[in-house]
Amino acid sequence: KASWRKPWVNSYGHSLTTSVSVSAPEQQLDFSYKIPLLKNPLEQYYLVQGGFKRTDLNDTEQDSTTLAVSRYWDLSSGWQRAINLRWSLDHFTQGEVTDTTMLLYPGVMISRTRSRGGLMPTWGDSQRYSIDYSNTAWGSDVDFSVFQAQNVWIRTLYDRHRFVTRGNLGWIETGDFDKVPPDLRFFAGGDRSIRGYKYKSISPKYSNGDLKGASKLVTGSLEYQYNVTGKWWGAMFVDSGEAVSDIRKSDFKTGAGV
């Protein structure tokens, strides 16, 4: 991965960041242009973001082009609020379904991150909540509502005992799930989801056995870390959760390790 940033584009304080990341399953090119508001440039600003991503992972093949305009408020309380408008054009094959979908959808987001202790925080927490809404009335190819919530808590007791908990929720409401791009569908599995399972390998499947993606997601993790000496830590964890489209067909998966 490589990135380049120009912190001062002009006398108004605009800045530009570009990044490129390349791996076997994903190749991505992004840019972000920040426009501070003169009345409060440190806490209020616009972001214009765009990019292209190619994905070939498990049963997903996708080419995605995106453009977004967002308005941010960084509050003194530590909370960040944003409203955004996104456009995307996706050509994808997910399992046995191939489609091209154009989306134009607004959304809102609120988040906060706090930490103490440097690169290995001894205390901290992170919350992020978002809602996105698409409707064919203004040109999108599919109607949907998407709600997501991510939470992380870190606490340390008596210097040596560190506890990390994580929780993720997601819900998609739509009448045409096959037209929802894979990037918006839910998959579980991997280091930040359910360890012990391949990355994004948990979801409902098509009749041929290919992954379909889910409209509902819930995962949770509890990890205990012990400071053996200096910078050496030992850890044990339990992860559990599911990615399903019918909550009546629960299929919880659990991973544990040390």
What is the predicted role of each segment?
Residues 70, 105-109, 128-130, 148-150, ...:
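One-face residue pattern on beta-strands with alternating periodicity enriched for small/polar residues
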Residues 50, 127-135, 142-175:
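Transmembrane beta-barrel strand/turn architecture of Gram-negative outer membrane proteins
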Residues 248-258:
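C-terminal beta-signal and terminal closure region of outer-membrane beta-barrel proteins
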Residues 30, 93-97, 141, 175-185, ...:
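Outer-membrane beta-barrel and related beta-rich outer-membrane complex signature
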Residues 162-237, 245:
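Extracytoplasmic gating/loop element in the C-terminal half of outer-membrane beta-barrel translocons
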Residues 53, 90, 134-136, 241-243:
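A short, flexible beta-alpha/helix-coil linker loop
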Residues 20, 131-133, 240:
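Short glycine-centered, acidic/aromatic-flanked micro-motifs in structured strand/loop junctions
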Residues 1-128, 155, 163, 192-196, ...:
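Gram-negative/organellar outer-membrane beta-barrel architecture
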